[in-house]
């Protein structure tokens, strides 16, 4: 791989300030010659619009003469196109009156290109989108007007033409006795399912997920509100709350219009505790004093929805494209699925989100997740903190972290016939500044 300074190659005498432009060439012995370019910029105005802007254009491609090696039983996959590559552009600009303009282009040649040539980006970074958005943040209020289209037909994505979101979070009402949160959205969405692979072996393990089997198109509007009543009972913080939503879909999985009402009432509480002992020291474990901080938490709620969750298409994605790509194979590899069937509800990712109370979040990224429930969530957050650094300049660090939670379901039907489930834990030991 060789990178070239494009400004020098093309003899550009007046290089725009705060910009870099490179060209790249690469020879892949078993695949072919590749070419690419990367242009990065940060300017005070762009497109004749005043305001600080920054962004990047990254393009790379090759005439591919090889095959893809994507893991077990995918060692020799024939690419769907001979010329393969991607064009990726991101732009963000601050306009007048605090309005933020964002634009993005994410064009990919075929379904396996990113997994083969950009595996870290494929696994870890956001999905490539093609669209534009305007956003304005005023104190605790945000409105967001966006439009995007699907340009890669091998991914399941929703075109929004357009979609308007409004958030109003943490607003104090009733003379500071309550707190109000709101999220309202309306848009015209077209859910476009992914096309099947051309490779015969890939096609044999491809089946669309439940809720994305067809093309769905229509208006979706929803408004979700929550009112909290925070109280202090001695050392315990208690927050009774009421949450409600009214949502409308112009096209459900049966191509009918439907209105759903949803209500949730519950109580959240937390009890913080701590103990500090400056005499605990260890050179071996790099400990100089120890503070143990614990927060015990409870979230108990009852919820009721007028419509079942499985009535709605996946207008909002739960997972990134990479995870959806895997889930379609997961159905065959792990569960021996048959094309046309769906994974059991016990393993359906929508049910995991529902049991984890995604619907209890006013700003939930997935409107479709909501159903009847009665759940108790018991959780603890624990920190063991110490001081590190040279004398006189010590700083506090989390030496160990242990978080754990368990969900209890009085009605076992809400949890696949089990009263307990979804036990999660997260333990981290920060041995040193460079190793965890």
Give residue ranges: language-model regions.
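Outer-membrane beta-barrel initiation region
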Residues: 1-51, 118-137, 365-398, 410-421
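Surface-exposed extracellular loop regions of Gram-negative outer-membrane beta-barrel proteins
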Residues: 11-22, 27-75, 105-109, 127-146, ...
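Outer-membrane beta-barrel translocator/channel fold
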Residues: 58-94, 102-120, 183-217, 257-261
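Recognizes the extracellular SEMA beta-propeller fold with strongest preference
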Residues: 83-112, 128-149, 154-162, 166, ...
